[in-house]
Amino acid sequence: MVIAIIAILAAMLLPALASAKARAQRMQCMNQMRQLGLGFPIFVIDHNDMLPPAGWADGTYTQPHFAVTWDSLLNKYIGGNASDVDLSAGSYLSGDAPKILQCPADRFPKVSWMGGSDPYLAMRSYAMVSAGTSQGPTGDFQRDPKNGLPNLNLAGKLGVGIVWQVLAQYPVANFDASGYKSSVVRDPAGSILLCENTHGQQSAGNIWTSACFGPQSLGDIYQIDPSAAPQDPNSNNGVNQGALLYKAHKNRFNYVFNDGHVEGLKIEQTIGSGTLTAPKGMWTVVPGD
């Protein structure tokens, strides 16, 4: 009889405990993202009002030392322990990665895109909102003649996270790691800087996952109905991790805005007059869209 009563009480308490745990993880994630957001203005001050790019790669694609990402550039501002030598070379050991790069609810298994054992595989749950990706000598985005950077007035150019990517066939391409001046963001309080972005190959220092291209990047567009999410081919367990993280956060993602504040929002609250596949609103630096 006593055992039965205890079992009933446990069954009643477990959902409440699970809900409390999820809320605690969501709040911890927000606090971590707030700390990450504080690293950006310090970087800007130290770099002549320039924001960091989301990432750049030198075209060799050999491990280690081929790419630098926003979290590498912010390492010393956000509690990392990587040496200047490692950071300037483009990689750092997993033990030197800031712990705040991993959302506490993001406990999904990761695999190295390099394959095999990877001492540089540290967890990262976040990405900058994309401004586009350059490839080869001329790049696949149109540059603004005023600054040589992606033209943010064009469709598909959302945030300030530039990915300077040189393909292996263009190892000596016209390549740089410039970022935008912070003044290009005309609506800092209404423009997302960092978003949650997890899947099977999301890891610190990985250029391929350093930028997010809108809601469709957050585990495709299936977070609103996680049960409809397709399998993630980049995950070693075949699970769409973005959809699961959205569900773990009670159908919300956390976002850092360009003014440094953090909000937890449903995806449909972020897209303004756009759509899930062509977002506007908080995904762009343009006010009022």
Give the location of each predicted region.
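Short, well-structured segments within or immediately adjacent to enzyme catalytic domains
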Residues: 29-289
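Intracellular coupling helices
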Residues: 21-28
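N-terminal single-pass transmembrane signal-anchor helix
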Residues: 1-21
